[in-house]
Curated annotation (Swiss-Prot):
GO terms for biological process: cell division; cell wall macromolecule biosynthetic process; cell wall organization; peptidoglycan biosynthetic process; regulation of cell shape. Catalyzes the initial step of the lipid cycle reactions in the biosynthesis of the cell wall peptidoglycan: transfers peptidoglycan precursor phospho-MurNAc-pentapeptide from UDP-MurNAc-pentapeptide onto the lipid carrier undecaprenyl phosphate, yielding undecaprenyl-pyrophosphoryl-MurNAc-pentapeptide, known as lipid I. NCBIfam families: mraY. It comes from Helicobacter pylori (strain ATCC 700392 / 26695). This is Phospho-N-acetylmuramoyl-pentapeptide-transferase. The keyword Nucleotide-binding does not apply. It is a multi-pass membrane protein.
Length: 353
């Protein structure tokens, strides 16, 4: 809106620069989240919209009165900042906002069910998976119709591994959406554990998106160019800004949880950025914490079903370390460090290829 008004009509050249608009979007989203979150917390407490805590985690029972669904606030702040600072005529921006809103809506349905039933189970896995699948399929098909190329790239290699047939690419993108959104959802079990790795991952992906959308940088760095995708940089930075605002209230001890309303939206948007910037494989490194958490659950379930034995004291793995006597803050900060280092290595692939 500001972009169209100040640059389109008044020709204020400052607004033609992605970096300026992305920075402005960051601060708008940050301060809007800071402003709205206390009001949301008061409202949620009045409505008793508290996070049901599993009986299997007795050390977390003191968190049972903490309100959830804080993700609604940072998703809303991101949308406002994006509408103000990004070009809404850009399809990559519109699809990114659809991903944020759509995945957040599925998460909201799940959170609402948990609160109503006072159960940690939420809506049925079949319903949740079905809604996420339909959303992922729609966005993947639209990306294909947009003309996003279907080459599969590996980190540190300048040439693609191969070109996927359209149907295979769409199926692969759906898998990336589903796996990433659920991985972030599984990680969201301790104060700040999902938000900070999401910030690191989004910052890395936003750099890749910016490079992919810039003809000079992509040519110099031998990176695949994606026409018009650079505008998504504005939305990504807005989401990072809103996450910093959310972290202000989510750091230990948390005053609010993001809930599935936030974690599914984050996972979906991270996946979207990885797909449009051709970083589906590199996402495994950038989202290392999400991968580790998900693998711990898969291994735990698989081991118990096949051998009737558990590999970990509890899954996801952050609870395993808690059971071993690690303080919650120690688990959180160490996971943050792993995430930060993983993303620094991932960024090296921009130059080393």
């Amino acid at each position: 809106m500001l972009y169209s008004l100040l640059y389109g009509y008044f020709n204020i050249n400052l607004f033609q620069y992605l970096t300026f608009r992305a920075g402005l979007g960051f601060f708008i989203a940050f301060f809007l989240t800071l402003f709205l979150m206390p009001k949301f917390i008061l409202w949620a407490k009045a409505k008793k919209a508290n996070q049901p805590i599993s009986s299997f985690v007795p050390s977390h029972q003191n968190k049972k009165d903490t309100p959830t669904m804080g993700g609604i606030v940072f998703v809303f702040a991101t949308i406002v900042a994006s509408v103000l600072c990004a070009s809404l005529g850009n399809l990559y921006v519109l699809l990114g906002l659809i991903v944020l809103v759509g995945f957040s809506f599925v998460g909201f349905r799940d959170d609402y069910t948990k609160i109503n039933q006072q159960s940690n189970a939420g809506m049925s896995a079949k319903m949740k998976f079905g809604m996420l699948f339909i959303l992922s399929l729609i966005v993947s098909v639209l990306l294909s119709l947009k003309g996003l190329d279907t080459f599969l790239y590996a980190p540190f290699l300048k040439n693609p591994l191969f070109e996927m047939p359209t149907m295979l690419a769409v199926g692969f993108w759906v898998l990336v959406f589903l796996s990433t959104s659920n991985a972030v959802n599984l990680t969201d079990g301790l104060d700040g554990l999902a938000s900070v790795p999401s910030i690191f991952t989004l910052l890395s992906l936003s750099i890749f998106v910016y490079v992919a959308g810039n003809a000079e940088f992509s040519k110099y760095l031998l990176y695949p160019k994606v026409i018009d995708v650079g505008e998504l940089f504005v939305v990504s930075l807005a989401l990072v800004g809103s996450l910093f605002g959310f972290l202000w209230y989510n750091c230990n001890p948390a005053s609010v949880f993001m809930g599935d309303s936030g974690s599914l939206a984050l996972g979906g948007f991270i996946a979207y950025n990885a797909i449009v910037s051709h970083n589906e494989i590199l996402l495994v490194l950038m989202g290392s914490i999400f991968v580790i958490e998900t693998l711990s659950v898969i291994l735990q379930v698989g081991s118990y079903k096949t051998r009737k034995k558990r590999l970990f004291l509890m899954a996801p793995i952050h609870h395993h370390f808690e059971q071993k006597g690690w303080a919650e803050n120690k688990v959180i900060v160490r996971f943050w460090i792993i995430s930060m280092l993983s993303n620094l290595v991932a960024l090296l692939s921009l130059k080393v290829r």
